[in-house]
């Protein structure tokens, strides 16, 4: 279940810090540093931040922003604290369907570092909604000297007038 992240702020920050200097942090932050979200109480109606909770246990964090003027969702971020828990994907997918069907958003864009284990799920979502995937080759080098691609997804939703 998605609940406002502010309710789990300290727990989310602690959980994310447990992944400092790890490959998981690299995939979340998109660089070699450690990134902590700034979980806000006042999000001005454009920043959405959620704790993903299962039976009272924090299992993930999901965030995105909406530019209401251009009807675009961007700045998506997802961190799983309970690998292989399908409820994370189910809850995030429900939120994405709400964005599409209730908010009638025109466009969603998100980015990731190639090799992220969730890439196959992002590809599936992109295919389902006839989106596009752009791969920029060897954009990022990790601590071990391995190059990773940068991946950009975009999906445009045609609205009936």
Feature annotation, model-predicted:
Residues 85-102, 119-120, 124:
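Conserved acetyl-CoA-binding loop-helix of GNAT-fold acetyltransferases
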Residues 47, 148-152:
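Short hydrophobic/aromatic beta-strand or adjacent loop that forms the aromatic wall/cage
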Residues 1-38, 159-161:
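A short, well-structured alpha-helix characteristic of acyl/acetyltransferase catalytic modules
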Residues 111-112, 127-148:
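Conserved catalytic-core motifs of GNAT/GCN5-like acyltransferases
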